């Protein structure tokens, strides 16, 4: 019987994490459970920075970006002795189960705790939308709006100066954020891990556009694929048109979550508590075709793959 639940946020922050925490806290308290917030992710869990939360702890947080519990990178959590200490801290507070909000690295920590017999539920909180078993992650659509606003502003200045602009977008090894941003932002070209890059073809396409009277272009590029500034130099040399790179960086993680992300996070937080009360542990939550689902967290990490949105890549190709 679950009586006390812990909740933490880990890895890169994402808009909507506070709404997810609120969903966990309010649902658990309403069911007569105690809730404990763990500050600064797995690092705080290891160091024992754990505090009991009440309803007022999550008042006025649903509209705030970031995470009031804080987050931290803590690669040392891979070590067995570190996790054993973390579990000791949980048991010292009488915490029976843990809700972890974060990306794939956070899921890996939850997986390790699960393998050590400690029940965890993972909620997908990352702007990268790179978690298997869910159509959307918490924060993804808010970040999408942030990127689109930036692209709109870049288009204003690019058209004024007849300039080619490269905009580097987060996502790591997943091109979802870049793909959707490129379609919604009306970008002329897209470079993601799924599409790869043929530089000669790209420069040729830009030259063809210039010959037809096109005065500017926006290129959407997923981070980590290449150096955006070096690519800008190559394009400028190949086309004779001024080319500049803009790295959006961490601005994509900030800002008030959209209504969609607030509702999604609230639903997932609520669902996580109900799963724990029903005796489920070692699960991760997702939303598929607007329905909440849960998967084995080990299977999700080791075996499940995110589908490539070939339908949207086809749309993008035909629109560009």
Curated annotation (Swiss-Prot):
It is an enzyme of class 2 (transferase). Coiled coil: none annotated. Substrate binds at residues 126-128, 163, 170-172, 223, 244, 250-253. It is found in: Cytoplasm. Pfam families: PFK. ADP binds at residues 22-26, 155, 186-188, 212, 214-216. It catalyses: beta-D-fructose 6-phosphate + ATP = beta-D-fructose 1,6-bisphosphate + ADP + H(+). Its cofactor is Mg(2+). It comes from the Bacteria. GO terms for biological process: canonical glycolysis; fructose 1,6-bisphosphate metabolic process; fructose 6-phosphate metabolic process. GO terms for cellular component: 6-phosphofructokinase complex. Its main location: cytoplasm. HAMAP family: Phosphofructokinase_I_B1. This is ATP-dependent 6-phosphofructokinase. The lineage of its organism: Bacteria, Pseudomonadati, Pseudomonadota, Gammaproteobacteria, Vibrionales. The gene is pfkA.
